[in-house]
From Swiss-Prot:
<feature type="compositionally biased region" description="Low complexity">
    <location>
        <begin position="196"/>
        <end position="205"/>
    </location>
</feature>
<comment type="similarity">
    <text>Belongs to the BORCS8 family.</text>
</comment>
<feature type="compositionally biased region" description="Polar residues">
    <location>
        <begin position="180"/>
        <end position="190"/>
    </location>
</feature>
<feature type="coiled-coil region">
    <location>
        <begin position="211"/>
        <end position="239"/>
    </location>
</feature>
<feature type="compositionally biased region" description="Basic and acidic residues">
    <location>
        <begin position="208"/>
        <end position="240"/>
    </location>
</feature>
<feature type="region of interest" description="Disordered">
    <location>
        <begin position="163"/>
        <end position="240"/>
    </location>
</feature>
<keyword id="KW-0472">Membrane</keyword>
<dbReference type="Pfam" id="PF10167">
    <property type="entry name" value="BORCS8"/>
</dbReference>
<feature type="compositionally biased region" description="Low complexity">
    <location>
        <begin position="163"/>
        <end position="179"/>
    </location>
</feature>
<protein>
    <recommendedName>
        <fullName>BLOC-1-related complex subunit 8 homolog</fullName>
    </recommendedName>
</protein>
<dbReference type="InterPro" id="IPR019320">
    <property type="entry name" value="BORCS8"/>
</dbReference>
<dbReference type="GO" id="GO:0005765">
    <property type="term" value="C:lysosomal membrane"/>
</dbReference>
<feature type="compositionally biased region" description="Low complexity">
    <location>
        <begin position="7"/>
        <end position="26"/>
    </location>
</feature>
<keyword id="KW-0458">Lysosome</keyword>
<dbReference type="GO" id="GO:0099078">
    <property type="term" value="C:BORC complex"/>
</dbReference>
<keyword id="KW-0175">Coiled coil</keyword>
<comment type="function">
    <text>May participate in the coupling of lysosomes to microtubule plus-end-directed kinesin motor.</text>
</comment>
Length: 240
């Protein structure tokens, strides 16, 4: 018990000593602050100097604010520029790439065509084929010209029906002239017989002429057919 009482009394004594030391320090600091306030001179400023100091402080604060905000403003402008111009640049690059591919394709086509032309010029069969084609075209033109001439000549010549009709008209005129030249006489048997004979002869001559003209026309048609067949055969042989 005695030991416990001693320890409790010791602790109380230490706590009281601590409080007393803290109070002494606070008193010393307070007295020191009062002494410093008494030693400081009192500042007295004019209105003009106060305005100048206020303006300078505002300018300094605005300058500091501007300097602090410059990086953010610069980044904003950079981002805006990128946002506006990057899509355009991407489209231009795509177009350039597509045009480059097209140019490459065209260049390959040109290379292939020049190579094929060189090979064609080296091969002689193509030149032979072209010469044969030219010859066949010339012969076909000649045949067309010949046929056109034959067609024109056939149109210039009178047709068979017109020939027969004209010959019939001529014979009829001759017959009428013969009838008008005959003098009227008494009907006798001899005169009747002679008239009949003349009429029969005229009719026979007329028929013979018509037959001759028809034979000539048939011969001309046969000749034209033979010439056409020969021309067609020659053309087929040359083409083959």
């Amino acid at each position: 018990m005695s030991s416990i009482l001693k320890s409790s009394t010791g602790s109380n004594h230490s706590s009281t000593s601590n409080h007393s030391s803290i109070n002494n320090i606070s008193q010393l600091s307070g007295s020191h602050g009062v002494e410093q306030q008494q030693l400081r001179p009192v500042l007295t400023l004019d209105a003009s100097t106060a305005k100048l100091m206020y303006q300078t402080s505002q300018e300094m604060s605005s300058y500091i604010q501007q300097v602090a905000n410059e990086p953010t403003i610069g980044l904003f402008h950079v981002q805006d520029h990128i946002r506006r111009n990057i899509p355009k640049n991407v489209e231009l690059k795509k177009n350039i790439k597509a045009l480059g591919e097209k140019i490459e394709e065209k260049s390959f086509d040109i290379d292939y065509s020049t190579k094929t032309i060189k090979t064609f010029s080296e091969i002689q069969t193509f030149s032979n084929i072209s010469s044969l084609l030219q010859q066949s075209i010339e012969r076909a033109n000649k045949l067309v010209n010949n046929k056109s001439l034959l067609f024109v000549n056939s149109q210039m010549a009178a047709p068979s029906s017109s020939k027969t009709f004209s010959s019939f008209q001529q014979q009829h005129k001759i017959y009428q002239q013969q009838q008008t030249n005959l003098t009227p006489s008494k009907p006798t048997l001899s005169n009747d017989k002679t008239n009949d004979n003349n009429n029969n002869n005229n009719n026979l001559n007329f028929v013979e002429k018509i037959e001759k003209e028809e034979k000539i026309e048939k011969e001309d048609e046969g000749k034209e057919k033979d010439e056409k067949e020969k021309d067609d055969k020659d053309l087929n042989e040359k083409i083959n």
